[in-house]
């Protein structure tokens, strides 16, 4: 009788253990996985030559999609509808059960970027690699399928929010034309490129009350007189000598997405990451070096990307208010 009881206990244990083996054990992701998605977006931005303000918009909404998923599972994270302007609340869908919310967050970022970036469809290649790696880790097809459905629901919600930010109206505005006044902006040779996003200050900000909430002091008054402050600033370009270290630092922060260089009779276009992508990369390094959790990293990336877009809205508002010629233009003249 004792032997029978013992065998019954062993059988129950084996059945319980076996059933648990079929259930999806939790698989965790790291901050690097978030950065990998953003790096994939950056590669497309370089490919598409996305301008800096627009690049910040792509980063912001992708991160918002990822954060929305994570915040529905982490009570310590504040809800976006209490932070962002006119952001509608979204409850976790009841129809989603066996999902990995971390995987859903990454997929929501990818899905949002796929719809917003000009060449976003190319991200399907990265998405497939991500899902293949999940299968190798032991994710079941049910978990992957449910995670994708969850991501699509959140991404659709965020894309609707993005569509309402008024960026899609900019194409209806008249083409920006220089006013021709001395010291005002004018296309710079050799490319003579048009003004970049002159109406970006009309886009709805995330956290600002208005685009001119932090209006800076006007720049030094333009003047060609040798005793003027503007002329003195111009001459610093010829008087100051930079060390090799300072030149390397300057080159490090040179984030012009598309610079045109004249080399004899040739014009060469050089494509680089945007300023926003530079800061996203730095954010990734900071999260990795401090061993931030996936959830905390998603919060940090979202704060940085939202701040980048609001920062561009403020800067571009002043850029076209002060209407100052580019330093390169002044130097060439």
Would you name each region that the model predicts?
Residues 2-10:
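Sec-dependent signal peptide recognition
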Residues 15-18:
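C-terminal motif of bacterial Sec signal peptides marking the signal peptidase cleavage site
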């Amino acid at each position: 009788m004792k032997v029978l009881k013992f065998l019954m206990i062993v059988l129950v244990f084996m059945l319980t253990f076996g059933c648990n083996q079929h259930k999806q054990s939790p698989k965790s992701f790291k901050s690097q996985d978030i950065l990998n998605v953003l790096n994939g977006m950056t590669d497309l931005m370089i490919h598409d030559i996305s301008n800096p303000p627009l690049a910040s918009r792509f980063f912001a909404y992708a991160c918002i999609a990822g954060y929305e998923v994570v915040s529905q599972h982490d009570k310590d994270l504040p809800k976006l509808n209490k932070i962002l302007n006119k952001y509608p609340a979204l409850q976790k869908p009841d129809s989603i059960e066996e999902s990995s919310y971390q995987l859903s967050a990454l997929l929501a970022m990818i899905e949002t970027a796929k719809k917003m970036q000009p060449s976003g469809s190319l991200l399907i290649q990265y998405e497939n690699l991500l899902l293949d790696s999940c299968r190798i880790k032991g994710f079941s097809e049910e978990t992957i399928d449910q995670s994708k459905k969850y991501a699509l629901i959140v991404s659709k919600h965020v894309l609707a929010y993005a569509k309402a930010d008024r960026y899609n109206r900019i194409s209806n505005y008249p083409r920006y034309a220089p006013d021709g006044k001395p010291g005002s902006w004018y296309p710079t040779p050799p490319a003579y490129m048009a003004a970049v996003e002159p109406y970006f200050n009309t886009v709805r900000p995330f956290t600002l009350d208005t685009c001119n909430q932090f209006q800076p002091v006007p720049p030094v008054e333009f003047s060609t007189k040798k005793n003027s402050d503007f002329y003195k600033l111009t001459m610093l370009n010829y008087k100051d000598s930079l060390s090799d270290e300072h030149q390397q630092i300057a080159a490090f922060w040179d984030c012009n997405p598309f610079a045109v260089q004249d080399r004899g009779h040739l014009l060469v276009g050089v494509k680089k990451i945007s300023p926003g992508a530079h800061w996203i990369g730095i954010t990734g390094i900071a999260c990795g070096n401090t061993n931030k959790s996936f959830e905390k990293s998603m919060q940090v990336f979202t704060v940085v990307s939202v701040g980048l877009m609001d920062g561009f809205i403020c800067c571009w508002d002043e850029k076209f208010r002060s209407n100052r010629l580019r330093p390169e233009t002044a130097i060439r003249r």
